Amino acid sequence: MYKLVLIRHGESTWNKENRFTGWVDVDLTEQGRNEAYQAGELLREAGYTFDIAYTSVLKRAIRTLWHVQDRMDLMYLPVVHSWRLNERHYGALSGLNKAETAAKFGDDQVLVWRRSYDTPPPALEPTDERAPFNDPRYAKVPREQLPLTECLKDTVARVLPLWNESIAPAVRSGKQVLIAAHGNSLRALIKYLDGISDSDIVGLNIPNGVPLVYELDEDLKPLKHYYLGDQDAIAKAQAAVAKQGKAG
């Protein structure tokens, strides 16, 4: 049996402001830093250790990983930073308040943009300052692979090459792997691992800063998964994530 630990970054400044974030590189709030540190404490107390970690190239995930490593005394851990673990690109919605957007377009439309499998939000114009083309962190990524908007289907297609080529081989080799990423890049991976249908994925909500443990068989098929921590608090956090895209 193998174990894989996933963690969504702690609360970011735009999580707090209920804004669509996507590839915009916002930082953690004080609460987010505390959530990350507490995640490290939960993992340490439960006896976990790691051989390698994976994260995105966005600071809210990177800093979350730092705090987990710090609390676990694993600052030396090899870390792979990949744009493939970035949050889903929210296109022209990037930076907009979710509730205000729902009030304008309707709860149902915003739910489709946020949680459906194959309907992307309106795309950015290539000349928009939020477009990734001139960002140095993506200088080595072929321009045609850089998105101006994404649906979850696009995010799955982006994440899976990293899983197949790097993460899965690391797990199979016996390494203890930690992934610190984002709500939708983790939803994409979980959809693949658990075989969740396109329609059912809409109901999957991942709370900030809570370790999610997957126990996998020799074929990397899930045997079970569970969150570490107070289960009532986790359920409330998941419900709060689900409400973010509603008008009020």
UniProtKB/Swiss-Prot annotation:
EC number, as in UniProt: 5.4.2.11
Pathway: Carbohydrate degradation; glycolysis; pyruvate from D-glyceraldehyde 3-phosphate: step 3/5
Keywords from the named record: Gluconeogenesis, Glycolysis, Isomerase
Sequence positions that bind substrate: 8-15, 21-22, 60, 87-90, 98, 114-115, 183-184
Enzyme's top EC category: isomerase
Catalytic activity reported: (2R)-2-phosphoglycerate = (2R)-3-phosphoglycerate
Main function: Catalyzes the interconversion of 2-phosphoglycerate and 3-phosphoglycerate.
Name of protein: 2,3-bisphosphoglycerate-dependent phosphoglycerate mutase
Organism lineage string: Bacteria, Pseudomonadati, Pseudomonadota, Betaproteobacteria, Burkholderiales
